[in-house]
Amino acid sequence: MSDEEKSETRNFFMGYDDLSDSSSDSESRSGPEATASSAPAEPQQSRKRAAEPLPRPDELFRSVSKPAFLYNPLNKAIDWDSRAVRAPEEPPKEFKVWKSSAVPPPQSYVTEENKKKAPAGMDMAIKWSNVYEDNGDDAPQAHRGPAHFLPEEEEEEQQPDSDDDSSSKLSKSAKKRRVETFQQKEKRKRDIGQATSDKNFVEEEKRILRQCLD
């Protein structure tokens, strides 16, 4: 830079300093005067505000300024639809066939002809009822009569006569009669014991009398 440019820059900053000094002096001079004049007015205003009642909510909200850009002047309501930001619509996806190594399906289907079955006939080597349990003609039939555990000849020999049957019935009925309850058994025992005790008492008295006579 040349000497002239340096001097111009210095003069510029020096002039700015002079302006700032003059403004600060004016503020310093006006400061105490303004405070002195506003000092008596402030307590009066504060007293007036304290004496006044608080405004109602309706009045308070009416006095509050509302931004005009949020309202529609015709309907006096917020037009949210116009202000909503929507995402850009995606283009419709195109269907693409997957690449695979599978064999494509045939264009036409052909049904295979039915294979020839074996000629109809009975296989004598297999009993179908035993294998598949389908109760065919060759399946074993269930015995529906009374069970016979012995041959017919032995059963006839072991059958008792009619007299034996009657005697066995009588013996069974007698056994049923002889069945006693626990209380009956105890009573019978007490009776037997009392009889024996009386007999012993009599025999003891006889023995004592014999001794006295001797």
From Swiss-Prot:
Family: Belongs to the UPF0690 family.
A Pfam family matched in the record: DUF4660
Entry keyword Phosphoprotein: yes
Low complexity bias (residue ranges): 32-44
Disulphide bridges, residue numbers: none
Superkingdom assignment: Eukaryota
Positions with biased composition (Acidic residues): 152-165
UniProt biased composition (Basic and acidic residues): 49-61, 81-97, 179-192, 200-214
UniProt keyword list: Phosphoprotein
Protein name according to UniProt: UPF0690 protein C1orf52 homolog
Region (Disordered): 1-66, 81-214
Source organism per UniProt: Danio rerio (Zebrafish)
Modified residues (Phosphoserine): 162
Keyword Protein biosynthesis: no
PANTHER family: UPF0690 PROTEIN C1ORF52
